[in-house]
Every structure is written in structure tokens, then in C-alpha cells.
């Protein structure tokens, strides 16, 4: 499964588009600072976080939780794309 985390208005065809807000036609509404994420362990083959990570983790526990969840949902050969400014 390919997942576009924190997609906002950038809806991608063929991907599961997740955002915190139900403003755009996303597939899943979920706060990325709330654990666990709504995906099975090892179920994601590609994860995209485009200008999202810098908005997460007001403290170290939350940031570490985000990283742990990304690791948990990634398949063994997953690709993780993180773009930050």
C-alpha cells in the first residue's frame, strides 16, 4: 500500500491519502500525533510525507512516536520519502 501522510490538498491517485482535517476528499482522517496509525504493521510499501514532518513533534516523545509509527507500518523493503524545507 502506498500512503500519502499529511496530504492536505495534494491528493494522489493510487495512494491512500491521509490528513488531520476532513477538508479535502481524503481517504483517511487521522492526527499523525495520535498513535497508533490506522495501518497494519508492515503494510506500507511507500510512504510520502511532503512538508509534514516539520509540523509534528512539539516535544521529543511525540516526535519519537512518529518515527516509531513510520517504522512499524513500513514493509521490510518500503520506501519512505520525507521532504522538509
Where does each model-flagged region fall?
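A conserved beta-strand element that flanks and buttresses the S-adenosyl-L-methionine
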Residues: 48
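Adenosine-cofactor binding site in Rossmann-like domains, unifying the SAM/SAH pocket
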Residues: 9-40
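Class I SAM-dependent methyltransferase "Motif I" SAM/SAH-binding loop
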Residues: 3-9
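Short N-terminal helix/helix-N-cap motif within the alpha/beta-hydrolase-1
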Residues: 57-61
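A short glycine-rich, Lys/Arg-flanked "PGG" loop and its adjoining helix->strand segment in the class I
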Residues: 63-79
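Local beta-strand N-terminus motif with an aromatic residue
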Residues: 44-45
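Short catalytic micro-motifs in class I SAM-dependent methyltransferases
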Residues: 51-55
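Short strand-turn motif at the edge of the Rossmann-like AdoMet-binding core
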Residues: 5, 83-85
